[in-house]
Amino acid sequence: MSEAIFVEGLTKSYGEKTVVNHLNLSVKSGTVFGLLGANGAGKSTTIECILGTKQADSGTVRLLGQDPKKCRRELFQKIGVQFQEGDYHKEIKVCELCEETASLYRKSADWRKLCGQFGIGDKAKTAVKSLSGGERQRLFIVLALIGQPHLVFLDELTTGLDAKARRGVWKTLESLKEQGLTIFLTSHFMDEVEALCDEICILKKGTAVFRGTVEQAKAQCGCEHFEDAYLKLSDEEADE
């Protein structure tokens, strides 16, 4: 199985504060990988450095075998990124935003079908600003998938969704994974991580304190429940 993401020695500092500390990651194609950690652990900066939208101080990154800083245009056609919010015209409708997004790609998925899969098929004529928080979140996932990416980054993918909607998203993502999609996600929902992730990495103050599977994390910590293992490894309770 080939690598979709390869990261070696990734480091990023702001002044004297190191926010990503010599991070090493490897994500196999066709798998779901979870990057976990408390708020401020370095997850967002890590993703920005991996994507090349933020300049790392040092380290090597390969996405689908290519350097994201040198092959941005080509990788744009192969990688989807879920944005939490966007600077859209206040009156733009869901259908208009989807069509505009589809026009950016050489090949695009049927956005109507994607909207249906994510439970917003009846919102095509609705203004984006009128959607609920959960509906907007699902729309942003759809937008990340319109370009038929080989690899997609999903940041806090089901924040704002109720339990039924969350499980619907999980089911759709599992189906896309079976079709070969590689998914890199962040989440604060440990049941979501258990349901979706083949492998995880837990960050604590920019340093990877665990890499492996959910079962390995539980075994390492002697915990029956993954949430307990996560809290122990991340020290999130202590940080709070």
Which residue ranges define each predicted feature?
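Conserved ABC transporter NBD signature motif
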Residues: 59-70, 74-75
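Conserved ABC ATPase "signature" region
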Residues: 99, 103, 108-123
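Catalytic Walker B motif of ABC-type/P-loop ATPase nucleotide-binding domains
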Residues: 152-156
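A short, surface-exposed alpha-helical micro-motif characterized by mixed small hydrophobic
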Residues: 193-195
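ABC ATPase "signature
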Residues: 211-212
